[in-house]
C-alpha cells in the first residue's frame, strides 16, 4: 500500500477520489492550453535532492545503474496503463505547438491521457493521430484483453482448474486472447521479456558495483525474478535489505487494475537511507512498552506485552518511476503485498522524508499563512511535523488489538466494522500526539524536539496547521474523516480556538488535557468494540462546520501536491526528466 502523505492523506489517487484544491479543471472535451496550464499548476514544481556524499564510490555507481533501470520501469508503466499509451506518447512528442507541449507535459505527469486527480477523466480529444482515446481510463488498464467484460473473464477464471485459476488471478500475469478469442494467461516474464531482460542486466551491473552484501543479494535475486516470474525469494531479501542505498523496484501495487485489483504495476523508488531519522524509530521502539503502560485508558485494556515494532525505515528519494512517479506523489509505502510474505514476516514501511519535506514546504507552509494567526506562524516546524508522522505510524501498534464480545475473542476491526478505519486513523493521530507530549515532559526528546514551552508551541501549532492540510482534500477517506473528529472535538473543548475569520489558534492551557480525553475516547471505543459509540461519534463530528469551511475556502489556490525534478539523480547519472 502507498500513502500520499502518511498519516495525512491516504493514497486514493488511483481510485480517482482525491479532491482538487479547486473545482475539477477538466470538462467534457479536450482541455485547452490555459486549462492544461491551470491543471498542471496544482502540482508545485520542486527540486528533489538527497545527500549521497557519504556513499562509497561503488554505491554511487550502483545508484546510477538503478536510475537507468528505473527509466525502463516508466516504459513498462505506460504499457500497463493502456495498450495505446506508448503510441499516443510517441505521437504527442511530434507536436511542438503550445497545445502539443502542454499535452506532453500533463500526459507525462499522469503517465497517460487521463487526469488522475480529476477522476481519471481524459484531457485529450476523443481521437488523436488516429488513436481513439476513452473518456476515462479503462478499468482493465492493459492487463486484460480490450473489450473483455468482467463477467466473461470471471466465468473463464471460475471454469479453470484451481492452479490455473490462481495463475490467472496472480499479481504477475496478464490475460490475453488468441485469434479465436479464447483467453489465456501470460506471465510478466513473457509479456515484458525485452524490457525485463534489460532490467535484469542493469540490476546485476548495479550489484557488481556495491560491496553491501544485502543490497547485492536483493539485486541479484530481483534480476532473477524478472526472468523467472517468481518474486518470493527477492521479496524476502528486500525485507532484509540493510544498505545505505535503498531500492524498491518491480511490480507491486494493484490500484491500476480497477477491474479486479489483481494485477501489479511496475514501480521504482531509488533512495538513500536516512540513518538519523531511522534511529528515531529505534528510539521509539525502545519506549513502546512504557507508552503502552501509560496510555490514557483503563489499566485492564493495556497490553502487558507489546509485540515487536514492524520494520520501518526512513529514506530520501533520489529517483522515482512508473507507479512511483505518477500524479500525486507517494510519501510512504508499505510492502510487499504478497500474503505469503506477510504471513511469515509481515511487511515493511518506507518513509520518504524528502518527499514529505517538499510537500510540507509547498502545501503546509502556504496553508499555515492562511489559517494560523501571524504570531503563531513562526512555530511551524518540519521536525515536529515529521516526528508526529513517525509517532502516528508507530502508535498504530499501541492500544487494544483484541476484544471480548459475548465471551468470545474478537478484534476492534471486526467489532467496529466500517467505522474502524476512521477511528483507528484518528486514534493513531491523537495517540501519537499524546506520546510526543508524554516523552517531552519526561525529557526523552530533549535532543530531537526539545522540551518546554517553545517546543510545545511548535508541536501543537504544527499539528493544528496540518489538520487543515488533511481537510483540504475533503472528507473522502478515513484519515480526513478522523481529522474532522479531532478538529471538531478540540474546538468543542476549547483546545482549538476559532477567531471567526478563518483563522485558528491553540489554547495551551487546555490542549494537553483535551488530547488525553480524546485519546481515552478512541482507545475505549476500540477496547470495548463499541460500534454504536463509534457511529455516534462519527455522526456528531464528521462534518465541516462553517468556521472550518471559511478556512478551507481561503485555501483554493494552494497546490494539491508536488512535482519533483530529480536533481540528485541527474547529477549522478544524467538521469532526470
Regions found by a protein language model. Give the residues of each.
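Gram-negative bacterial Sec-dependent N-terminal signal peptides
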Residues: 1-19
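Short linear, low-complexity motifs centered on an aromatic residue
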Residues: 2, 21, 84-87, 222, ...
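Long, low-complexity intrinsically disordered segments that are proline/alanine-rich
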Residues: 16-28
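N-terminal helix-rich structural modules
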Residues: 27-218
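Fold-level signature of zinc-dependent metallopeptidase catalytic domains
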Residues: 36-48, 53-65, 163-445, 449-467, ...
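Zinc-dependent metallohydrolase catalytic domains
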Residues: 76-83, 357-367, 372-387, 400-577
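Long amphipathic alpha-helical segments
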Residues: 83-87, 217, 236-241, 477-482
Amino acid at each position: 500500500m502507498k500513502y500520499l502523505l502518511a498519516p495525512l492523506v491516504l493514497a486514493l489517487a488511483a481510485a480517482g477520489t482525491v479532491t482538487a484544491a479547486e473545482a475539477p479543471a477538466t470538462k467534457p472535451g479536450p482541455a485547452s492550453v490555459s486549462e492544461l496550464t491551470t491543471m498542471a499548476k496544482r502540482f508545485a514544481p520542486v527540486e528533489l535532492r538527497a545527500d549521497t556524499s557519504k556513499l562509497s564510490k561503488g554505491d554511487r555507481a550502483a545508484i546510477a545503474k538503478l536510475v537507468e533501470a528505473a527509466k525502463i520501469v516508466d516504459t513498462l508503466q505506460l504499457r500497463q496503463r493502456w495498450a495505446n499509451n506508448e503510441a499516443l506518447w510517441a505521437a504527442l512528442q511530434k507536436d511542438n505547438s503550445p497545445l502539443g507541449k502542454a499535452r506532453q507535459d500533463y500526459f507525462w505527469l499522469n503517465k497517460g491521457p487521463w487526469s488522475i486527480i480529476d477522476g481519471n477523466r481524459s484531457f485529450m480529444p476523443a481521437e488523436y493521430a488516429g488513436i481513439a482515446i476513452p473518456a476515462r481510463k479503462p478499468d482493465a488498464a492493459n492487463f486484460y484483453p480490450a473489450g473483455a467484460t468482467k463477467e466473461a473473464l470471471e466465468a473463464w477464471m471460475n471454469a479453470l482448474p484451481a492452479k490455473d485459476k490462481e495463475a490467472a488471478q496472480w499479481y504477475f500475469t496478464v490475460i490475453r486472447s488468441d485469434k479465436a478469442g479464447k483467453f489465456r494467461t501470460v506471465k510478466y516474464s513473457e509479456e515484458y521479456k525485452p524490457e525485463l531482460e534489460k532490467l535484469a542486466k542493469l540490476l546485476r551491473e548495479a550489484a557488481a558495483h556495491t560491496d553491501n552484501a544485502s543490497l547485492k543479494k536483493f539485486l541479484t535475486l530481483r534480476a532473477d525474478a524478472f526472468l523467472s516470474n517468481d518474486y518470493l525469494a527477492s521479496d524476502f531479501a528486500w525485507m532484509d535489505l540493510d544498505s545505505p542505498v535503498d531500492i524498491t523496484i518491480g511490480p507491486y501495487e494493484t490500484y491500476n487494475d480497477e477491474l479486479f485489483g489483481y494485477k501489479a504495476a511496475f514501480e521504482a523508488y531509488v533512495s538513500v537511507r536516512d540513518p538519523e531519522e531511522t534511529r528515531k524509530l529505534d528510539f521509539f521502539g525502545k519506549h513502546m512498552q512504557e507508552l503502552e503502560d501509560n496510555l490514557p485508558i483503563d489499566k485492564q485494556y493495556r497490553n502487558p506485552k507489546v509485540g515487536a515494532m514492524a520494520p520501518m525505515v526512513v529514506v530520501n528519494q533520489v529517483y522515482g518511476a512508473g507507479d512511483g512517479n505518477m500524479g500525486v506523489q507517494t510519501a510512504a509505502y508499505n510492502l510487499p503485498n504478497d500474503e505469503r510474505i506477510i504471513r511469515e514476516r509481515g511487511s515493511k514501511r518506507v518513509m520518504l522524508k524528502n518527499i514529505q519535506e517538499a510537500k510540507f514546504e509547498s502545501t503546509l507552509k502556504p496553508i499555515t499563512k492562511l489559517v494560523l494567526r501571524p504570531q503563531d506562524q513562526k512555530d511551524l516546524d518540519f521536525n515536529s511535523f515529521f516526528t508526529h508522522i513517525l509517532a502516528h505510524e508507530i502508535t498504530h501498534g499501541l492500544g487494544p488489538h483484541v476484544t471480548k464480545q459475548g465471551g468470545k475473542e474478537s478484534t476492534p476491526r471486526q467489532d467496529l466494522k466500517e467505522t474502524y478505519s476512521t477511528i483507528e486513523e484518528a486514534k493513531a493521530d491523537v495517540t501519537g500526539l499524546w506520546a510526543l507530549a508524554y516523552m517531552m515532559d519526561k525529557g526523552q526528546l530533549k535532543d530531537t524536539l526539545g522540551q518546554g514551552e517553545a517546543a510545545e508551541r511548535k508541536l501543537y501549532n504544527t499539528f493544528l496547521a496540518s489538520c487543515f492540510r488533511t481537510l483540504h482534500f475533503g472528507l473522502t477517506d478515513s484519515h480526513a474523516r478522523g481529522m474532522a473528529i479531532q478538529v471538531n472535538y478540540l474546538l468543542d473543548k476549547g483546545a482549538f480556538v476559532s477567531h471567526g475569520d478563518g483563522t485558528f489558534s491553540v489554547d495551551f492551557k487546555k490542549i494537553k488535557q483535551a488530547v488525553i480525553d480524546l485519546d481515552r475516547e478512541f482507545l475505549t471505543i476500540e477496547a470495548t468494540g463499541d460500534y454504536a459509540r463509534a457511529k455516534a461519534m462519527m455522526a456528531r463530528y464528521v462534518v465541516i462546520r462553517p468556521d472550518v469551511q471559511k478556512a478551507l475556502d481561503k485555501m483554493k489556490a494552494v497546490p494539491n501536491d508536488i512535482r519533483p525534478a530529480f536533481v540528485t539523480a541527474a547529477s549522478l547519472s544524467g538521469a532526470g526528466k
